[in-house]
Amino acid sequence: MSASNLLPMISSNPAQFAQASLAKAFAPRVAQGQQSVLSFEAMLSTNMLDRIGPLASREDLLPPDAESTLEDLQKDPLALLPPHMRAAIESMDQTPQSAVAIDDHYVAPAPIQSSRITWNGGSLTKPELQIVAVLNRHKDLCPLSWESLEAKVNDPSTPPDLKAAIEALLQDPELFYAIGSQGDGRCGGKITAKDLSEFSKHHPQVAAFQESQAQSYAQNYIPSDSAENAQPSVMTENDALRELYRYSEYLPKNLSLADFKQIVDGEAKTGKCPPQVIAAAQYFVSHPEEWKRLYGGNIDKVHKEDFLEVASSSMSLTQAELDTLKTINSHQELFFGSGDLTRDKLASMADDKSLDPKVREAASQLLSDPLLFGLLNNAITGYKTHHGFFDFGGGHTVDSGNVSKEDFGRFYTNMTTANRTVQQPKFHVPETEAAQNAVADMKMGLADQPDIKSPKKNGGASCMSSTPCCG
């Protein structure tokens, strides 16, 4: 089940997400509701048969085709009713609506402990696995307290997939308790990012579910910086590099094949982790030789900063990014005449109707492109905040937010062949349910864009290398 399918399921079938804890609370009313429906149908059936019975014994009074009609009525006594009444009665027999309609918005006052599912055991339902998978994609918004969940649902800034998952979680206080009770089995009323990682580690079901999702994501990839109407394609190494670069602020300090598997399984210490990042991690899990080749063929585990150095010279830029660089290069006085290029300056240029439309378009594109901005911003400094054991004092700032004319010149003149090569993805139409669910999740990821990277002060001298991998 896709995260995009949670919301309509919640609105139409709220009881499907309610687990054993709510079943205890609602059991009397559920039984009563079901008994009422059954009694009503039994009464209706008996009443119909009482009327049909005498007629059935008087064959001489029946028209030629009545016998078959009566047999049909005995099988379906509702057939005599007008269509609107029949539809109303049949709708009563739908357990999710009849059983809990009056408590559609009921929320337990606190998480509920259960033996069905615990912090390190028990079996999760498929909807619960989907809830956990979505929560694992939003560890940056933890901790989540039980009391804050409804506010999160009503917060316009809450990503749509997380909103749907929280609405489902509100109907499953047992799952909340199990996640939030890591270590000692006692829930303090909140879920932390560490709780989610540990819960995922203790429940192999989560890893199996998320690995299946990740494989589908990698086969039905939509870039996180694409338009909403984009079509999916099979992820490439370049796609994986770009996604990991864009969301590097939320990745673990070290990256390896084992770390990527933890990202896929929900066990890693991550922040924002949309389906695009999960697909990137899965890509390298599935192609370990490509990961190692980035570092000469033998190295697996690297510092995140080392990855950024290599990725910056190994990834391809889009045609829009190359066009932006070309425009900036031919209008350097406009972009750098009054000093360094900042996001505020780009916003002002994008809104300045007196400027050439191409200049405004380039300013707008760079403003909305954290990947290209980062490449320019760190072209001279590189990404390492410490270059040696004895480095201290002075130095530079990584992700400073200020792009100098020298920064631009360094990157533009040292772009690699890979940087200048525009990739041509082969799009396809998702045909299976799994593929369609993956595409829906990918589009959910478009709403979870990376935040502006925070400046990081270096403790020592800046990187003096003139190679592209340092910028």
From Swiss-Prot:
<comment type="function">
    <text>Regulates cultivar-specific nodulation of soybean.</text>
</comment>
<protein>
    <recommendedName>
        <fullName>Nodulation protein NolX</fullName>
    </recommendedName>
</protein>
<keyword id="KW-0536">Nodulation</keyword>
<dbReference type="Pfam" id="PF05819">
    <property type="entry name" value="NolX"/>
</dbReference>
<dbReference type="InterPro" id="IPR008718">
    <property type="entry name" value="NolX"/>
</dbReference>
<feature type="region of interest" description="Disordered">
    <location>
        <begin position="448"/>
        <end position="471"/>
    </location>
</feature>
<keyword id="KW-0614">Plasmid</keyword>
